[in-house]
Amino acid sequence: LFAALRLIEAGYRPVIVERGKNVRDRKLDLAKISREHKVDSESNYSFGEGGAGAYSDGKLYTRSKKRGNAEKILNVFCQHGASVSILQDAHPHIGTDKLPRVIENMRKTILDCGGEVHFGTRMDVLLIEKDTVVGIETNTGKTFRGPVILATGHSARDVYRWLHTHGVEIESKGLAVGVRLEHPSLLIDQIQYHNRNGRGKYLPAAEYSFVQQVEGRGVYSF
């Protein structure tokens, strides 16, 4: 979505090919996973408009030092319905209830500016000429040509197999494994505010994080 908006700024009319469904219809498929244990291989937590983070709690925070123009990203979210508070908060947070609407509004901007969005359309073949990707062929048999941005997320294994089979150089990336740790909010407030009574009536819940190096690897909370 952000790549498409950037292309629009540069005068292009981007075409988004999305193998999953739109952000609203995805909710029905996610409900089936929880209630009926039925998984749609093309519409689930990984595939669909907004990607794997569409139904997260919308935290907008990074420890990376290669952040780029983070302020511009936050402004785009605000322009499409996120609270302006994310521009000032140390740990900006859109919220699970608001994020799908923000994603829909971003799609509307793309369409209003002449872009296209095709749902239920999977890339099956990269069209390569003289070692340059010039387009894609989809599962519907339709071909799209022009500049291609391949944003596969982390679970499109069929894409990686295709790339490997056709000699495209790929390499593995570091994997972070998360576990959930819970601490009583009163305990954290007492520690962070240095007050045995916690935060009192007026202060917000205290923020905290843990960072440690174990055998040369970083362990951190997020």
Model-based region annotation:
Residues 1-222:
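Residues forming the flavin
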